[in-house]
Amino acid sequence: RVVTMKFLLSLSCCAVLAGVRMACFGADAMSSEYRELWGPSVQAEIDARIEKHRKADAVVAGFKPGTAVEVEQLTHDFKFGAHIFNFDQLGSREANDAYKATFTNLLNAATVAYYWSSYEPVKGRFRHAAGPHDTAAFWDGVAALSAEEKYNRYVEYRRPAPDPILDFCAANGIDAHGHAMIYRVSQPDWVTNAAPTDAEQIGLYRAHIRELAEHVGTRVSQWDVVNESVRRDAPVDAPDDTVFWGDPSRHVPAGYTLACYDEAAKCLPKGVGAAINEACVIDDVYLAFVKSLMDRGAKIDIVGLQFHIFNAEEMVGLAKGAHKGRRGYCYTPARIKATLEKADRLGRPSHISEITVPAPEETPWGEAVQAEALRDLYRLWFSWPSVYRITYWNLVDFTYHKESLASGFYGRDMRKKAVYHVLDRLINHDWKTRLSLKSSPDGSVSFRGFRGTYRVRGIGADGQPCEKSLNVR
C-alpha cells in the first residue's frame, strides 16, 4: 500500500507539473520532441537534485510546547543575478525604477561593468564616479536613439560608472561581481597604440589589475580576472591564448592569461574570488585550457560558463527539440549535463555567468517559448551541486547593441514578459520555504528548507511572542 501511495503521489506531482506548464506556456509553445527531451524522467532527476543539494535540515528550540510556529525564508544563499549595465539608461524614471526593482524583488546579485576602454579611456583617467553621461537625465534626453546609435556615440552606453552601482548594490544587499579585469575586446586604444613589447603589455595588464583590486577592494565578491581568452581553434592537448577568437588581427602577448592570474593572486583582497569566463563552454578546449592554467599554478577559484543563443532561428529549433544549432550544438539537457560534468572535473564551483535565451518573435507564442526554455534551464542549473550562481545577461529587450533580440525579462516598454513571471515563481515561491508548524513537547521545531536566512516566529517558553533569526546552511 505504501508503494502504491508513493506511485500515485508521483503521478499526481507529474500531473500538477504538466498542468503548470500547460497553464503557463500553452499547449503549442513547444513541440512534442522538446517535451520528450525534457520529459518526466528528466524533471524528476532535477527535482531530486534540488531536494538533495539546495536544502538543509534545521532545528529551532525555545518555543512553548504545542504552539504554532511560523517559518519564513527571507533570503537565498544561491545567487540569482543579471548584468546591471543599463543602470539609469532606460529613458524614463519609471523604466529605471522597474529595472532597479528587479535586483531587489527578484534577483540578489549583479554583474558590474569594468570594461577597460570605458573605465580608463585615457591613461590615468578613471571613470570611478558618475560623470555627465552617467545621469538618468542625460539618457532620458537620448531615449529616441537606437541601442546601436547609443553604443556608437557614447562610451558610457552599457558601461556606466561603477562606483554608484556598487553603492546601490551595497545598500540593497546585492552581491556584486566585477566583469572584467582583462578582456582583449575592451583594451583601450592607448594600450594598443603604444605598441609595447609583450613584456611591457603584460606589465600594463598587471598594473590595471592592481588598480582595480586596490580601488574596488571587497565591494565585489569576485572578478572575472580574464574574459574570453582561449584560442578556440587550438588543439585540446595544447590550448593557448595567442589569438583572441573575435579579433585575430590584434596582437596579444602569449601567456598573458597566466600572468594575469599570477597578479590577481598577489593583490586581490582576501575572500574575493578569481574567476575565469568563456563563451565556448561546449568546446572541450576551454576546460582543457583552464586545467592547463591551473596545472601551471594559476589560482582560479571559479569557472564561468556562458550560455548564449544570439539567434531567433536557433530558438525555433530549440522549441522543435533540435539536437544541433547553428554552432553545432543545442542546449539539450543531456548536452548541458555533459558540460557541467566536465567542468566538475576541475574541482571548482561553476558560475553560469552569461545567459541569452531570446523569444524567437514578439508574439505570445515567442514569449512562451522563451519562458518555458528558461524555466527548464534554470531548474537544471539550480539543481547542479557545483553551480552556485546564475547570471542572465540583458534584462530588457533590444538593449544589446549588436543583435536585435527580444531576449529580456522585460519588453522594450518595460512590460514584464512571461519569463519574468515564470522565474519569479521559481525564485520567490517554489524555491523559498514557508511553513506553519507546531512545536514539539520539548519546545522545538524541525524542518528541511532551502538554504538561506530565515525568520521564525512563535510563542516563547515564557509565554511571550518571540522571533528568532536563523541561517540554514
Give the ranges of each region predicted by the language model.
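Aromatic-rich peripheral "rim/lid" segments of glycoside hydrolase catalytic domains that contact
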Residues: 35, 215, 224, 229-256, ...
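Active-site-proximal loop/turn and secondary-structure-junction residues that shape catalytic pockets
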Residues: 86-88, 116, 182-184, 227-231, ...
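Substrate-binding cleft and catalytic face of glycoside hydrolase catalytic domains
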Residues: 111-125, 140-274
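Short Pro-Gly-centered beta-turn/loop motif in secreted/extracellular proteins
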Residues: 92-106, 446-453
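Bacterial N-terminal signal peptides
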Residues: 10-21
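Hydrophobic faces of well-ordered beta-strands that scaffold small-molecule active sites
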Residues: 80-82, 107-112, 176-180, 221-225, ...
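Beta-strand-rich domain onsets/edges
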Residues: 27-89, 109, 121-122, 129, ...
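Glycoside hydrolase catalytic-domain groove-lining segments
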Residues: 122, 156-171, 175, 243-277, ...
